[in-house]
Amino acid sequence: MTSPRLDVAIFSYNRGAYLKNCVDSLQRNMPGIGWTVYDDGSDEPDTVAYLQSLGERVLHMKSVGEDRHGGYYNNMQAALDGSQADYLLMLQDDLQVVRPFAQEDLSRIDQVFDQSPTTVFISPLFLKGSKRAYFQQRYQPDAGLRCYRWSADPEETGKVPQKYADIAVLHVARLRQSGWQFAGSEEGNGALADRLFGDMVQAAEPWVFYVPEEPAYRGRVLTFGAKLAVKMSGNTVKSFKDMTAQASLAFAQRDLSV
């Protein structure tokens, strides 16, 4: 049986050091996985220099107009349209792959999609400790498939993350068959996914997380808070130590009901 193909799309804008940390972590922990950077017209010199060093790994996109998200969702659509993989992992430049991603991880993704025919999104993200109560109130473990499924009150109106999140593993064929076109916001995509698909699944062994204190952009402009944070603590990437292979194995064998 042929193993499914997983590729990675990384979306970047003017955060060269963060992009390098993301790419380096991907190469360490997901060797052999194909990846492409979709850059939204970066013009910061260090970022441009790093992008040039990646050569053909980079697709230089350019957003149009004054969209507060730049060309992010257009670039996500371009990645989906151009993908030749079965599954596509969408990342941003401020994310890090924090543990080794093994063949068993890909097999679990494949099993979830195979046994959940209305599922098109799987979250690869570790959750912040501050959201522990939120998670425990809204998810139940599926021990057979090693994942968590949404089980909150059906009257909840928000569809992020019940149906969709920007950072996810996508089932390429199902999205194409539905005629999926990314909306211009995470909330808009959540509403669209609510009409078309079942709930998003949370991986029980996530492998991706946001690095802390990253500079944030709104409408291609660095936010005031981000400028203040850079001034106070510098612009050095505060990256994570990778989880060891031994720790990853113990993580994958833990009791999900605890």
Question: Where are the predicted features?
Answer:
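Short, acidic, metal-binding catalytic loop of nucleotide-sugar glycosyltransferases
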Residues: 24-33
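A recurrent flexible, glycine/aromatic-enriched loop bordering the glycosyltransferase active site
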Residues: 149-170
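Conserved donor-nucleotide/metal-binding helix-loop-beta segment in metal-dependent transferases, i.e.
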Residues: 100-121
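C-terminal catalytic/acceptor-binding lobe
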Residues: 164-173, 177-258
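Active-site-proximal specificity loops/subdomain of glycosyltransferases
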Residues: 43-83
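N-proximal low-complexity "stem/linker" segments adjacent to membrane-targeting elements
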Residues: 1-24
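Short aromatic/hydrophobic "clamp" motif used to bind/position activated sugar donors
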Residues: 88
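Short beta-strand-to-loop element that shapes/binds the nucleotide-sugar donor at the catalytic cleft/hinge
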Residues: 117-136
